[in-house]
Amino acid sequence: MPECDWVLERPVPAITDCHFYHTMDVPGHGLVHGEWDLRGREEEYLGGVDVSGKRVLELGTASGHICFWMERMGAAVSALDLSGDQEWDMVPYHGLDLGRRIADRQSHIERLNNGFWFAHAAFGSKARVHYGSVYDMPEDAGQFDIATMGSILLHLRDPFLALQRLSGHVGETIIVTDMRPGLKCRVFDRIGGFLGIRPLYFLPDAGRCEPIDTWWRLSPGLIAEFLGIAGFPDVRITRHRQKLQDREIEMFTVVGSRR
């Protein structure tokens, strides 16, 4: 396992070198536009969990909107994310120029990291970041009360391994937020529930070579089972909507707690 190298601050990048995943009101700058606008719905996104006074580990902070919101709510936040030095879990379609796709994604991630540090300075954030793979959570990363995984598992080749590696660092609660499966998937979920089966939907399509960066649709029941196996058996599921560009997207949050 790698050692945990926490980054506390970086030189503030030029905004022209930034990409913002979240729409945010950045102090001293104003509104920046991103794909997701979670403003005013952060509490629902986190399943109503009170983070005040808690040590929180956020996996996949992206532009940091949820990170900075949790700080304003009184949490001490640490984040784990990718940098341009790590590879996204791309789907390795045969015949696809995966090397070019990986290079393009790494360049995009660097701009995303820049957006985080631009906002980090503007908000006066004290959050720290470790850059690395979720599969290789450093043993010396420390212990946290709460961990959050916002729209992360669907992008991972092995979502359970990531959750398992995370679980040893969390003492109280893991919060998993994801996109709600579509109508067809929900029908199969109901049938699966009746049969005692927890469906997992594989999204990559060899004929289209798409999607390139998303592997799964996970049902709330499956994530609840993941959490139970990992030692967080007291589970609560909530549903909500969030804004993705100009659309309202159905989401769910699974909160798993230790006994």
Residue ranges and their predicted role:
Residues 148:
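A conserved beta-strand element that flanks and buttresses the S-adenosyl-L-methionine
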Residues 54-62:
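Conserved class I S-adenosyl-L-methionine
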Residues 76-82:
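Conserved SAM-binding motif I beta-strand of class I
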Residues 1-27:
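N-terminal, positively charged/glycine-rich alpha-helical extensions of SAM-dependent methyltransferases
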Residues 124-134:
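Conserved SAM-binding strand-loop segment of SAM-dependent methyltransferases
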Residues 63-75:
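Conserved SAM-binding loop of SAM-dependent methyltransferases across substrates and taxa
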Residues 109, 135-139, 144, 157-258:
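S-adenosyl-L-methionine-dependent methyltransferase catalytic module, highlighting the catalytic core
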Residues 31-54:
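Conserved alpha-helix/loop element of class I SAM-dependent methyltransferases that forms part
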